[in-house]
């Protein structure tokens, strides 16, 4: 069995080196090109999908659409879920990473970005950009909508969707594409690869590059590689 992850193509805020999180930004021109190249590469290598899963953020949805279009599979059903959203970076969202490091120190920013269980400064619920004010999340209980997350909390958010939707799809024989975000994919990778809390800090997933997992019947990883 195979599973394909793809992190969205470069976003406009990736290009500007800003913390993004749940803020909804578009793909950059480079990001659009990365998504198109990924779709063509998947087609060239014979990858076909029966179902695709993505987040409710534009950059991931757009990447999913482009990948499927460029691989002549735009008909493939897509399921969008907030559970595959990027990690919520709290009050860091919209800030320049370099300037934030100059203010708080490189080590503190590294911990905020990469540690497994350290939360960023939380966003106020009445902030203009709070997810509590976004109709995408209006159906969710208020205590479920995050104001900031670490990777541990992100995994706790993503894991129920893996267990309820993605894993059963794979086990039923469906060929699955997951188009999501750096940290939601890192969280899933931690789970399926059994990566330790310490080692996950070093895992980077590049934008717009298909990551293929070969899995056994128990969804244990046999092999993984980038196309």
UniProtKB/Swiss-Prot annotation:
Record EC number: 5.4.2.11
Keyword check for Isomerase: yes
Alphabetically ordered keywords of this record: Gluconeogenesis, Glycolysis, Isomerase
Functional pathway: Carbohydrate degradation; glycolysis; pyruvate from D-glyceraldehyde 3-phosphate: step 3/5
GO biological process: gluconeogenesis; glycolytic process
Active site (record annotation): 8 (tele-phosphohistidine intermediate), 86 (proton donor/acceptor)
Entry binding sites for substrate: 7-14, 20-21, 59, 86-89, 97, 113-114, 182-183
Xref: InterPro entries: His_Pase_superF_clade-1 (IPR013078), His_PPase_superfam (IPR029033), Phosphogly_mut1 (IPR005952)
Domain of life: Bacteria
Marked site positions, Transition state stabilizer: 181
GO molecular function: phosphoglycerate mutase activity
Reaction equation(s) it catalyzes: (2R)-2-phosphoglycerate = (2R)-3-phosphoglycerate
UniProt xrefs under PANTHER family: PHOSPHOGLYCERATE MUTASE
Family assignment from sequence similarity: Belongs to the phosphoglycerate mutase family. BPG-dependent PGAM subfamily.
Annotated function: Catalyzes the interconversion of 2-phosphoglycerate and 3-phosphoglycerate.
Annotated protein name in UniProt: 2,3-bisphosphoglycerate-dependent phosphoglycerate mutase
Native source species: Neisseria gonorrhoeae (strain NCCP11945)
